[in-house]
Structure formats: C-alpha cells, structure tokens
C-alpha cells in the first residue's frame, strides 16, 4: 500500500470553497431556527457512525477512533454532550441523516458527488484512494475487465458510483453484487475468509485490516486520492456546516488534526506479510501463557502495548540474548536490571515487571509539553537510542521550525541524527536514529495488530455464541425420558 498522507492542497481547496459558500451564514449561529440552535437547545450533538478500526471502536471499555475523537471535540466546542449511534451498514447511516435521527455522519466517508444531491459535505480531514482487494493465493486481476470471480461492494458506499462510471466509460460487461448487511470492513473480512472473491475499500481501511488479516492484498487502485469528510443534512440554513468549518480550521491551526492523523494513520503505510503472519501466530501460540503477566504489570500503559514492546524486543522469548549482552523478555541490560531489582533477566515475570517500571520512569522524564497520549512514543525512542539523543531530536525539530512536542514532527528527524550535517549541530552527537524510528513504528504496528486481532476473535466468539443461543431457542432441549419415549410425553386426548 502506498504511503498515506494528507492531501493538503485538496483539503485547502475544499475548505476555501466551503468557506465561500457558507460565508453569509457564519455570523448567525445564534438564530432561533438554525441547526446549531437546535443542537444547543437539546444539549446534545447526534452522530451516526460504524464500527471500524479508524472511525469508532471500544478499547478497555472506552470509545476510541479518529472520527469519535473529532466528534467529541466538536461537541465540547459547541458546549453539548456527544450521542453516538452505531449502525451496521452505510445505507442505514444515510437513512439516519434523511430521517433527522443524526446531525452528522462521522464514519470515514468519501467525498462523493452523487451524495451531494441529497446531503452536504463538510471539511476534509484526510484522503484515500479506492482499491480492489483480493485474497493472497488467488489469481491477481490486472484490471476490472480481468475479474475471475464475483465482485461484492457495500450498499450505500461511494464505490458504487465509481463502478457505474467505470462501467459506462470502459467496461460495459462489468457486473457486481451489492451487500446490504455488511460494511466495507465486513466485506474485507469476507475476502480474508475466502467467502467472496473481491471487494473495493479505501486504502486506509485496507492498511488497517491487513494488520489483522494479512492474507488481504491490493490488486490496483480504482481512483486517485479522494477527500474524506463528514456529511450533514442539506438545509437552507448552513449554521452547522459553518460551525464545522470554524472547528476544523481551529483544530488544524492547533495541530490537533495532525496529531490524530499521526495517532491513527501514521504507522499504517508499510506492510510486511511474513512478519505480520508470524506475529499473529505468536498471539495464538505464545501469548496465552504470558498474557496475565502483561496485564498484571502494565500500570501506566495498556497491557497490549507492553506486550507489543516485549515482542519487538524478544519475540516473547524469555531466553533471548543479543550480542551486546541484553537479555530476557524485555531485553534489559545488566545495569538496568540491577537498578530495578531484577535478579534473573531470563525470568519472564521479573523481566516484564522491570521493563514496565523502566518504561514508566522514561515516560515521566519526557518533557511536560508533550501531550499525554504521545509521551509513550518519545519514551520508546529514548528507551531505544538514549534519552539525551531524544532531546537532541526535539531540539533539531525546533530548529527546523517543527513542533518539538509533536511525535509526527520529531519522528521524521530521528534518522537525521545519523547524518553528519545534522548530528554536528546537536549536543550529544551521532545516534542510530533510523533504528529508533523503526523500533517505535514496529511497536505501534504490533499493538495495532494485537488489539485488532483480539477484538476480531472476541467478535467471532460472540457471533458463535449468539448463533448457538438462537439454535437452542429454535430447538429447545427436552428431558431424557421424553426424548426416549416421545409418545408418552404427549398430552392425553
């Protein structure tokens, strides 16, 4: 998958056009009949979304996702509470908007001209391309005229209008099925499971799903990069879109959108099939025996992140040893182990406890200006290449007019610490910054895979239990005597 990035020119153009369209309405947020007044009167902002690794999901019983975080900030900006409705498919989302059950659709939706006939698009906050996906091990199609199986796409998706345009323009025999009960992510799952041959999804969703289902692969792009946006009702009054424009401009100026982009998209761009398959196999075969230790000693960070750090260090091998003498699950040096009262570095529990304590210590040392949810990445870089070199990277970032408190800005300077023209400007000199960069990115990918894989397994288990419960209800159990003597169990006439 190609490297994901913000299309700033496209975002800027859409924002300017939207600003010009909304300019007359911006001053009157406080009107008695406008949408913003309705939202403030009821005290809640209603959004509809779908479950996906990017838009909305729960982790540790708390909501997360890029669209969720933006929507929560927008609700706070308006001074109201956020109400989230999760729908099973895209078609239901747009029904919510048409039926006035939602103020905004925040679900990673592509800017689409057909949708503008009924709905209004808001500002864009990242961009994607539409891609055809198939399963590794099957024949790779060269183009849409070369499909050897059935193409299935989600009802209500922008992919349908793209296919209609391509059919009219280039492939008149092109045909496809429309799924009314699955989201695009659900169809990606179906391709991974071998239940359907092909589907179309956006490049970001594919990159995220490959961390859980590495058997997914991209055949080719269907479109160029397109903006992703929120949708609202098409009303004469534009107060809601005007407020959204102001909000997104504020979030962009404050660096919030860039931080969310880094948090949710910054580590998605590269994909290693073999490494991902090996990691998922280790989750099944090795993690069950040591999971309780990560859960027990993960104090300041999520246990799955601690597990990802350990996998990057040792592949969960308690006897791992490097040529430099570091050992164990967390690959501690002798001096670090001594400072943490770890007497046996090859003891899994001692090593995990010590590594967790050391990581907590490193996070506490990170300068206070760094946002709470980014401190761990700075700490990991310091853990890998040394705290002093991490400070050098921050200073170099500031010298180059970047934000030293932003991981997105600092991480791209890490490789510069191994180049003389840059490290000669630093206090502590040469460092293997490219290794620290790769180290942190790998951990983030492992964490993403681990969280998604475990959630997917829980989802499948819940579906299985629900199916079994439905079966039991349809065919209730009977007493053994009644089963052996069915006639005697019947009521007398």
From Swiss-Prot:
The organism of origin for this protein: Erwinia tasmaniensis (strain DSM 17950 / CFBP 7177 / CIP 109463 / NCPPB 4357 / Et1/99)
EC main group: lyase
Name recorded for this polypeptide: Membrane-bound lytic murein transglycosylase F
Similarity comment text for this entry: In the N-terminal section; belongs to the bacterial solute-binding protein 3 family.
Keyword DNA-binding included in the entry's annotation: no
Catalytic reaction(s) noted: Exolytic cleavage of the (1->4)-beta-glycosidic linkage between N-acetylmuramic acid (MurNAc) and N-acetylglucosamine (GlcNAc) residues in peptidoglycan, from either the reducing or the non-reducing ends of the peptidoglycan chains, with concomitant formation of a 1,6-anhydrobond in the MurNAc residue
Keywords: Cell outer membrane, Cell wall biogenesis/degradation, Lyase, Membrane, Signal
Single GO MF descriptor: peptidoglycan lytic transglycosylase activity
Gene field: mltF
Membrane topology classification: Peripheral membrane protein
């Amino acid at each position: 998958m190609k490297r994901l990035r913000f299309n700033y020119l496209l975002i800027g153009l859409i924002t300017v056009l939207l600003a010009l369209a909304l300019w007359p309405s911006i001053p009157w947020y406080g009107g008695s009949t406008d949408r913003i007044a309705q939202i403030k009167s009821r005290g809640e902002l209603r959004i509809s979304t779908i479950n996906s690794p990017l838009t909305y999901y729960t982790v540790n019983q708390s909501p997360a996702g890029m669209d969720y975080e933006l929507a929560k900030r927008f609700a706070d900006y308006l001074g109201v509470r956020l109400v989230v409705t999760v729908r099973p498919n895209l078609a239901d989302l747009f029904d919510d908007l048409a039926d006035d059950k939602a103020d905004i659709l925040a679900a990673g939706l592509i800017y689409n001209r057909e949708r503008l006939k009924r709905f209004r698009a808001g500002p864009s906050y990242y961009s994607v391309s539409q891609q055809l996906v198939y399963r590794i091990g099957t024949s790779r199609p060269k183009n849409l005229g070369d499909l050897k199986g059935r193409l299935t796409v989600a009802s209500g998706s922008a992919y349908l209008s793209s296919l209609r345009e391509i059919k009219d323009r280039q492939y008149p025999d092109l045909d496809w099925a429309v799924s009314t009960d699955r989201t695009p992510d659900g169809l990606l799952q179906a391709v991974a499971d071998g239940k359907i041959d092909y589907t179309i999804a956006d490049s970001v969703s594919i990159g995220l799903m490959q961390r859980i289902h590495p058997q997914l692969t991209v055949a080719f792009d269907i479109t160029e990069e397109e903006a992703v946006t929120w949708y609202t009702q098409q009303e004469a009054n534009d107060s809601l879109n005007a407020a959204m424009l102001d909000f997104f401009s504020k979030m962009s100026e404050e660096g919030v959108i860039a931080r969310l982009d880094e948090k949710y998209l910054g580590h998605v761009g590269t994909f290693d099939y073999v490494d991902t398959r090996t990691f998922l196999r280790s989750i099944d075969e090795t993690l069950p025996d040591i999971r309780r230790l990560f859960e027990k000693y993960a104090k300041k960070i999520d246990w799955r992140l601690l597990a990802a750090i350990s996998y990057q260090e040792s592949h969960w091998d308690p006897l791992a040893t490097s040529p430099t003498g570091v050992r164990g699950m967390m690959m501690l040096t002798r001096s670090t182990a001594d400072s943490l009262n770890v007497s046996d570095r090859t003891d899994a529990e001692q090593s995990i406890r010590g590594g967790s304590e050391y990581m907590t210590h490193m996070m506490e040392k990170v300068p206070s200006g760094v946002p709470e949810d980014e401190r761990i990445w700075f700490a990991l870089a310091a853990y890998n290449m040394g705290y002093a070199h991490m400070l050098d990277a921050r200073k170099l970032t500031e010298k180059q007019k970047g934000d030293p408190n932003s991981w997105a800005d600092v991480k791209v300077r890490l490789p510069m610490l191994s180049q003389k023209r840059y490290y000669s400007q630093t206090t502590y000199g040469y460092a293997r910054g490219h290794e620290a960069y790769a180290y942190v990115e790998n951990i983030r990918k492992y964490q993403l895979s681990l969280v998604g894989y475990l959630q997917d397994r829980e989802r499948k288990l819940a579906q299985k239990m629900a199916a079994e419960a439905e079966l039991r209800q349809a065919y209730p159990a009977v007493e053994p005597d009644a089963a052996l003597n069915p006639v005697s169990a019947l009521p007398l006439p």
